[in-house]
A protein has these predicted regions:
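Rhodanese-like catalytic fold shared by cysteine-dependent sulfurtransferases
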Residues: 1-28, 32, 39, 47-80, ...
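Short, surface-exposed ligand- or partner-binding patches at beta-edge/loop junctions that are enriched
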Residues: 84
Length: 124
């Protein structure tokens, strides 16, 4: 409940910031992931969704715990972070949340349903 309220508050707080400018399409993301090894690929879906399939090199931090766990799991606030979910709604909310938390090099990859490249299953 509290996490939901925080997400709604953050969404409203950053509604004026054009998060669409932070979008990256799958082909550009793939090119960069293949050449830049320091990019963090962040999956904000549930653990169940992650186990079913995810993009290789992904780090799972579900949206409902992102505000609480970001500082520990994503200590470098200047690192390039590509955020994705299933359809793009949670990734957009996650980008807004991370902006509020001080992260500055964010890209909204959108949904894995638009990812035409290899995915893997399992926990890691």
């Amino acid at each position: 409940m509290i996490v939901g309220v925080i997400i709604i508050w953050l969404y409203g707080k950053y509604a004026d910031k054009d998060v669409n400018k932070l979008r990256i399409d799958p082909s550009e993301a793939k090119k960069r992931l293949d050449t830049e090894k320091d990019i963090i690929l962040l999956d904000v879906r549930t653990e169940k969704e992650y186990v079913e399939n995810h993009i290789p090199r992904s780090t799972l931090i579900p949206l409902n715990v992102l505000a609480r766990e970001a500082g520990q799991k994503l200590p470098n606030k200047q690192a390039a972070i590509f955020v994705y979910c299933r359809s793009g709604n949670r990734s957009k909310a996650a980008v807004k949340m991370l902006l509020k938390l001080g992260y500055s090099n964010l890209y909204n990859l959108g949904g894995i349903i638009r990812w035409p490249y290899k995915t893997v299953s399992g926990k890691k």
